[in-house]
Amino acid sequence: HLTNIGAGKRYGKISEEIKQRLDFELEVIANTGYPGYFLIVQDLIAAARDLGVSVGPGRGSAAGSVVAYCLGITSLDPIKYNLLFERFLNPDRVSMPDIDIDFDDEGRGKVLDYVIKKYGTDQVAQIITYGKMAAKSSIRDTGRVLDLSLGETDRIAKLVPNMKLNSIFQMKNDEMKQNLRGEEYSNVKQLKEVYSSNDLAGETLKQAEILEGSLRNTGTHACGVIITPDDIREFVPITVAKDSDLYVTQYDNSVVEQAGLLKIDFLGLKTLTVKLIKYNHKIDLDPNQFPLDDQKTFNLFQRGETVGIFQYESLGMRRYLKDLKPNVFDDLIAMNALYRPGPLEYIPSFISRKNGTEEIRYDLPEMEEFLKETYGITVYQEQVMLLSQKLAGFSKGDADLLRKAMGKKIFDLLEKLKPKFIEGGAKNNHSPDILGKIWKDWEAFASYAFNKSHSTCYAWIGYQTAYLKAHYPAEYMAAVLSNNMNDIKQVSFFMEECRRMGINVLGPDVNESFYKFAVNESGAIRFGMGAIKGVGKTAVETIIENRKDENYETIFDLVKKVDLRLANKKTFENLAYAGGFDSFKSSHRAQYFYIDSEGTPFIERVLRFGSKFQENKKSSQMNLFGEQSDNVYQVLKLPDCSEFGNLERLKNEKEVVGIYISAHPLDDFKKE
């Protein structure tokens, strides 16, 4: 019923092809016992949209299902892109279907609450993850237990390259010379010397080697949620999450699936851009409605300006995009599938064929129908499945077996299917020699072939992010910076991209900044106050809340208004160091740290003044004229001292943010 209503909305007129496909899918879903699964997912997504949570386009093999498309679970038409349902669920293969749904980061909690409310706390659990001891943490833990000094433990742990301890200590000298370069080589040499000594440090390394890889702690799977038809304790062992009252399974992801439980992946999609656009431009955007022929977006791909674009941001990919000059969505799907170890070697030929410098050839004219979009190169498993049906009359189940045999390199199965393919093709009047060549090509290509449903979904998410970057560059980059706020290397990398794009990134400012990076009225990006060390979310909230009616004029104005229980001395000091008060024209950064004759920094005196002012206001000790009876304000004057020098100012910025914001120490030495 729901599928038919959805089909009417999605397609308008239902053609015979669509009707047959829907009947086939619904029959398989009913026979494999999964109608409930589809209904739960459909209900979740509808509820999320009602709650104002943005939902991604759906990823993975589920994109091959027309039923999922009609129910609003996925947002790409599988018939238009030749995506196959058998890739997701087929009558001969009864493995659990797995639908990955993206909810935006902030909305995920809301959806989880909805699931618990609907199905009850005793039928919903998150999935446990087991954290293992890695090389460095096993050294640190062992050092702590054996009482090796903290400094020495840290020094040894920092020598470990990105390798297992066991591999390091078994490595022979000539292997070391061959595989390790420069600093890594000398570090490993030192490690081996410590290992072979009989002192406490040597003992620490020997014990750490034994402990490496053992389970250290448990966490919660960021995305997975289990829903059971009855009390969850009847199905799996459970425990309670560390940071909430929610149940968590004691089985991890792989076991849960084998136990045949209903697993739904919640994956947080970054939808901050859309929120920023709404805030700045008062436009409500739905990325699932973006047109797939937008010239501005394709121009961005053609210039290779895809830094910060999902799946298309690596250096190699950007180079290939410039050569390929993609101008249709199919090109993006193919590049996503080809840009991986293995099929990478096909990219130059793919580019030449697209640009007309290499001839497009088909072994049989019938192959053009399915290989045209990839210029005669077999890129997807789906193409092999469709061609085996068309050329040799394979059933849908056989075609999926062939895919499985190729993808997993099951050579016995391939041997079994080959005669079936040659004979079936011969019945359709195709030359056995040509069929043999096609089969040989497929075998060579088999291990590379990619799932087109995956590629299409990834390309669609990549396209949506590129569309936003092309049309709303400042908002998009502000969102990218916010998503990487905790990784300062990434922040400076993306700030460089902003400079290339001609977007100004301004330092933090208590009158303009939010917790995350945002775009101001003049189209520049403002640093997020949350990126400053020691400045917490609640402190930022009270600063934002109290400037709604008017901006803060001075530091005194600020401490009179904000809740000083939430914004403490550390918050104020680090804001000052980062330049958060630079918009107060009457003062400069050094004044806040001026120490008076009693040894008190000025910022501390300002905070005392603020507390006193707020106390007095509370106890409403006002005189007749409504003025503050306590005259503290007049006593505090900005100290007279010289400003920080350029280098000191920058050193302070780097200390509290991790990067230089207002300039760079070497700017003075730039060539004119």
Residue ranges and their predicted role:
Residues 1-672:
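Noncatalytic, beta-rich nucleic-acid-contacting surfaces in large DNA/RNA-processing enzymes
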